């Protein structure tokens, strides 16, 4: 029989019990709208299969009015589909309480209802529920939550930035690390941690069009974040009134958005908590005028609370451009360019003084006077202690200066010079004779730098005339691969056509196992190619990538890189090397560069090596030099004027050396210390590695897979294949693929095998599986036989699991203070609680299953006795619950008060602390304390134990 819904009726969500009591708002056609006042959430359900249970109390139940007074139900009346409860209050006065006035925070005794209804579950499910509660609680308390589950090597500076930024309310910061230090990973960590904590629920990512795929791959592969990529086609074809409203994470190309006013209107209307803008240094701003892209981002930044800008370093940008990024974050603070220049100049001597302290371990008289003038009287004691050689005082002094840094809270910028762990590079150039077949090709960059593409484009050729039959680079590549034997080699070329042709050449001419990787392949096809390359035993020796196809991928398990050709821009060159040159690379990078002599390829090699020094070192000046010398460079690549060419390379080398000297002298070591975390990040690294070594997750997941009917088989070392079995319990289990998936718990394995799912406590499969356990009712009842000689046969013990539950928005993060750990009670016949003396695991080892029919018969026979004991159980754990709530309130208040005091004091000396940030923190404290005050005990599960 179909459910009858009426506005005002109270229902509870079967899948989201934490939302509290729901109120039916409307029934519109096939949709049902329910409001959950406790959290402010609204849900829409299909009328046919809404996951809702009607809230209907019975005589004898005690219920609560929204004003807080309680009523013991004597009679229930149905008035036009709405329930009216009649009973007496705490003073034995008669009262009437319509269901519309019920407290939104009322908890339900669903476990006892199921027990007495004969819905008794297997013992294994009761244990699974208990263990799920304990693991879930532990993760909520962990400082690593949102940081440790990423498919990446834990790196100190990235973790420090992620925690520092993600733990703020509506962070507004500039991430300006040097190339290769992982700004995208830092941004992904911030997004991931903010989503998991509830600080953000909707995220907008704006990127240049050519980086959309790279971001899509990074977010999906590293963070398991399902990002919706929007372009003109998807926007037009969507049936939704506002396509953006259905996306929790939207990835949008800025070029398209600027040209589409309708899409802009929809984007503004959708509402976002956090905006991330990549390549923000390309947003053009001058005091007189801003570009359309800058103006659009500025408008979005005015209405979106959190903003992350990913950009080049301030030294690369120049002061004016750097100021333009800062004013996007806080236009009130950064409103005057001239004032900003003056402030920056005033601060430079302080940074130089700190550099002296870091380098020499002491301060000269000049540096001492500079810092004293900056800190005032309050810094005199610290300076005196520093002068006496107190290292702790030096650390405190640096912290004081950091807090006063003009942009220290909004700007994070790490440099390779300050970060350890990068590999060295070795260059191996191979000049080769230019074949005569290329001599007659038409002029143009494509023909001159990539002659094989131009040759093939001339028309159909026989197999014997294909370019890879005569191009000496192919002969060289085959010989090199044979010399390196089974060593993994990554080959990158500019075009997909070249990559595919090279695979043909290796197959036909050498039989060397190779695979290809280009933008014409689907993500799944690329994953398979990458996995084939990564396989040490049976995999390909060589992976041949096109320029675009390799974006966002990590192949650092290899250390030989062949550049079959060279890209036309130094940024692309750095991207190529960056596929292998990453923190954590254990070997020296071997760069193999074959090029055709007396050709533009040779000159481009000379430009990068002799002019830009871009092979052996990163080239932070490459973009500026390309912009400055580009107009002269391109014509000279093809011309034979040796004198003009030599002059250009020499000029570029001199300019590069000058720019690098400026960059080095402009380094702000104080800012680097703040960005690197000064040791805090390393503690996070060690904690994550320690967590990786534990076996709790694999053990737990094996029981979860067994419970849900997921078959688990060995795949290879440190890897398992999961497949749904015929007895799969719930089709909604988040396996990820109906055909099955390959998983690993090993971080190293996951980094080299991107086709495998990397399971951590944060993975959607783990979180989704735990949610299915806790949101469902399975496992909240059980009956068992206990084999213990100390107990008389027939003795009945009652095990009750309670949870301290807070109904509140996720953004308050109250699970950090009052996690839903099980409060356990084990009652004997005399009402004594034995839980402290008998551990859960110890008890479990003594239990045997009882057939369901026998269990039900026993429960029905003992119903009254069991009901009385269940009613008495809450009093046993109530003191523990109240103590936990009080401790949670104390921790929340202490943390919030400490942070409020720090920010308030900081604001007095550093204007980048926003009033809105302090106000939001104060409100969060108030709301959190109020919600904890209403924390209630909920009976989670019941297990009846009969001695036999």
Curated annotation (Swiss-Prot):
Transmembrane segments: none annotated. Residues 473-627 form the Helicase C-terminal domain. A motif (DEAH box) lies at residues 278-281. SMART domains: DEXDc (SM00487), HELICc (SM00490). Residues 164-332 form the Helicase ATP-binding domain. GO terms for molecular function: ATP binding; DNA binding; helicase activity; hydrolase activity, acting on acid anhydrides. Its EC number is 3.6.4.-. One of its GO terms (biological process) is regulation of DNA-templated transcription. It is an enzyme of class 3 (hydrolase). ATP binds at residues 177-184. Interacts with the RNAP. Has a higher affinity for the core RNAP than for the holoenzyme. Its ATPase activity is stimulated by binding to RNAP. HAMAP family: Helicase_RapA. This is RNA polymerase-associated protein RapA. It comes from Pseudomonas entomophila (strain L48).
């Amino acid at each position: 029989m179909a459910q009858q819904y009426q506005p005002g009726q109270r229902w509870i969500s079967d899948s989201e019990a934490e939302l509290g009591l729901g109120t039916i708002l409307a029934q519109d056609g096939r949709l049902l709208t329910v409001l959950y006042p406790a959290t402010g959430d609204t849900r829409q359900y299909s009328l046919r299969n809404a996951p809702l249970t009607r809230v209907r109390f019975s005589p004898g139940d005690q219920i609560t009015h929204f004003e807080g007074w309680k009523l013991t139900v004597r009679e229930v009346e149905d008035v036009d589909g709405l329930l009216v409860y009649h009973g007496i209050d705490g003073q034995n006065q008669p009262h009437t309480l319509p269901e519309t006035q019920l407290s939104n925070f009322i908890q339900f005794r669903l476990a006892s209802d199921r027990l007495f209804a004969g819905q008794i579950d297997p013992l294994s499910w009761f244990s699974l529920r208990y263990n799920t509660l304990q693991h879930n609680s532990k993760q909520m308390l962990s400082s690593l939550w949102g940081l440790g589950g990423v498919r990446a090597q834990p790196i100190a500076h990235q973790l420090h930035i992620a925690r520092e930024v993600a733990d703020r309310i509506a962070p507004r910061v500039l991430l300006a690390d040097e190339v290769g230090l992982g700004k995208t990973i830092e941004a992904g960590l911030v997004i991931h941690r903010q989503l998991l904590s509830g600080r953000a629920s909707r995220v907008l990512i704006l990127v240049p069009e050519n980086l959309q795929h790279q971001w899509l791959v990074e977010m999906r592969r590293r963070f398991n974040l399902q990002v919706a990529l929007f372009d003109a086609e998807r926007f037009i074809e969507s049936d939704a009134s506002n396509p953006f409203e259905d996306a929790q994470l939207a990835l949008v190309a800025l070029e398209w958005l600027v040209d589409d006013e309708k899409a802009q209107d929809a984007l503004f209307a959708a509402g976002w908590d956090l905006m991330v803008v990549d390549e923000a240094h390309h947003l053009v701003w001058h005091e007189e005028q801003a570009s359309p892209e800058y103006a659009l981002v500025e408008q979005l930044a005015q209405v979106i609370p959190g903003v992350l800008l990913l950009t080049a370093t301030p030294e690369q940008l120049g002061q004016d451009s750097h100021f333009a990024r800062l004013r996007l974050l806080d236009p009130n603070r950064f409103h005057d360019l001239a004032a900003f220049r003056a402030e920056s100049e005033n601060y430079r001597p302080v940074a130089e003084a700190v550099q002296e302290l870091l380098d020499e371990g002491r301060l000269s008289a000049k540096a001492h006077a500079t810092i004293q003038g900056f800190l005032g009287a309050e810094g005199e004691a610290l300076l005196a202690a520093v002068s006496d050689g107190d290292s702790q005082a030096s650390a405190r002094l640096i912290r004081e200066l950091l807090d006063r840094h003009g942009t220290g809270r909004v700007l994070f910028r790490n440099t390779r010079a300050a970060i350890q762990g990068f590999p060295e590079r070795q260059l191996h150039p191979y000049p080769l004779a230019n074949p005569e077949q290329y001599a007659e090709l038409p002029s143009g960059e494509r023909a001159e730098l990539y002659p094989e593409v131009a040759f093939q484009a001339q028309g159909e050729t026989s197999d014997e005339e294909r370019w890879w039959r005569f191009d000496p680079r192919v002969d060289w590549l085959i010989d090199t691969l044979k010399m390196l034997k089974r060593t993994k080699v990554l080959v990158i070329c500019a075009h997909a056509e070249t990559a595919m042709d090279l695979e043909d050449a290796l197959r036909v001419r050498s039989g060397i196992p190779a695979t290809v990787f280009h933008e014409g392949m689907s993500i799944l096809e690329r994953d398979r190619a990458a996995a084939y390359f990564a396989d040490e035993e049976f995999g390909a020796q060589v992976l041949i990538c096109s320029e675009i196809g390799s974006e966002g991928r990590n192949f650092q398990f290899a250390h030989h890189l062949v550049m079959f050709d060279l890209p036309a821009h130094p940024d692309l060159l750095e991207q190529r090397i960056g596929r292998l040159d990453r923190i954590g690379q254990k070997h020296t990078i071997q760069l193999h560069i074959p090029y055709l002599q007396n050709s533009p390829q040779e000159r481009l090699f000379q430009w990068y090596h002799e002019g830009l020094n871009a092979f052996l070192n990163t080239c932070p000046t490459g973009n500026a030099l390309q912009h400055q010398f580009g107009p002269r460079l391109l014509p000279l690549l093809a011309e034979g004027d040796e004198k003009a060419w030599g002059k250009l390379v020499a000029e570029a080398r001199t300019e590069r050396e000058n720019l690098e000297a400026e960059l080095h002298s402009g380094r702000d070591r104080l800012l680097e210390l703040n960005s690197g975390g000064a040791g805090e990040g390393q503690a996070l690294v060690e904690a994550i590695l320690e967590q990786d070594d534990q076996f709790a997750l694999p053990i737990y997941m094996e029981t979860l897979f067994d419970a849900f009917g997921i078959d688990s088989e060995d795949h290879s070392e440190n890897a398992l294949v999961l497949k749904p079995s015929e007895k799969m319990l719930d089709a909604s289990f988040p396996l990820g693929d109906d055909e099955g998936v390959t998983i690993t718990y090993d971080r190293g394995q996951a980094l080299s095998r991107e086709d495998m799912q990397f399971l951590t406590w944060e993975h959607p499969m783990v979180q989704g599986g735990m949610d299915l356990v806790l949101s469902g009712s399975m496992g909240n009842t059980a009956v068992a036989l206990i084999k213990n000689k100390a107990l008389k046969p027939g003795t009945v013990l009652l095990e009750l699991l309670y949870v301290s539950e807070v109904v509140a928005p996720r953004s308050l993060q109250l699970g950090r203070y009052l996690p839903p750990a099980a409060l356990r009670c084990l009652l004997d016949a005399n009402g004594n609680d034995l839980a402290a003396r008998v551990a859960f695991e110890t008890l479990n080892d003594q239990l045997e299953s009882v057939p369901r029919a026998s269990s039900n018969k026993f429960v029905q026979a003992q119903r009254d006795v069991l009901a009385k004991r269940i009613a008495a159980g809450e009093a046993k754990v109530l003191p523990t619950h109240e103590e936990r709530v009080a401790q949670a309130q104390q921790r929340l208040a202490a943390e919030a008060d400490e942070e409020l005091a720090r920010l308030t004091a900081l604001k007095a000396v550093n204007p980048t602390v926003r009033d809105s940030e302090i106000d939001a923190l104060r409100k969060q404290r108030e709301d959190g304390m109020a919600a904890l005050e209403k924390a209630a005990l909920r009976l989670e599960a019941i297990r009846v134990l009969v001695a036999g």
